[in-house]
Amino acid sequence: MALPVLVIGRSGSGKTYSLKNFKPEEIGVISVEKGRLPFKSEIKVIRIKSFDSAEASPAQINVARYSWIKSVIKQCKTKSIVIDDSQYLLANELFDRANEKGYDKFTNMAANFRDLIHFVNELEDDDKIVYFLHHSELDGDGREKVKTIGKMLDEKLCVEGCFDVVLYCQDNKFFTQANGQSVAKTPEGMFELEIPNDLKFVDTTIRDYYGMEENNTKEDKQK
């Protein structure tokens, strides 16, 4: 099975910047909203495909959008993939379906997002890691949690519970455990409590911990 990893943090905290130490052949980036990286790089960024159509309902458009993402993840040749920023999948669907009445749409939104995570978990590729870069917000206890679109969705889905590895990014650092400040969590002994916001280091450490194939270029392997 592939491994989904969640990275949460406020805008500008260093989530996307953490990709800087990857080489272009090592990482694929699916951009939901932005089209460029915050540093100079030859890493390929794929903008999410537009499915706007007068003949399709907003619900159908969003199903097509998620299906396209799943297809890209499955076909991508890199061992590591990033979805940046994944919370816009929820936010954009909310705006797309703003004219729909009733609560069923919130259940649909939660199901679409959950199914994407489950797709990664069930993908028959033991060496693939998919990173969900996601904005955070404060919960009722004052901790940073996954930003969703309100209590209606939170009641349907605990996003953090779908991941074994959740990192909290703040001030260009990753925090790996819930210390009262966030909902971060990682397996015992995988990381120190505080590490640099270097997703390449995270990727290498996770692969070593779980015995996954290394994600290195041919030049690196020959050294």
Per-segment meaning from a language model:
Residues 1-76, 80-82, 88:
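Conserved P-loop
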Residues 24, 40, 125, 160-161:
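Short, well-ordered coil/turn elements that cap or connect secondary structure elements
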Residues 27-29, 130, 166-168:
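Short, well-ordered beta-strand core segments
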Residues 48-51, 133, 169:
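Conserved beta-strand termini and adjacent loop/short-helix elements that scaffold enzyme active sites
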Residues 72-76, 120-124, 163:
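Hydrophobic, Leu/Ile/Phe/Ala-enriched alpha-helical segments that form helix-helix packing faces
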Residues 80-158:
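P-loop NTPase motor core
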Residues 138-223:
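Conserved GTP-binding G-domain of TRAFAC-class P-loop NTPases and closely related GTPase folds
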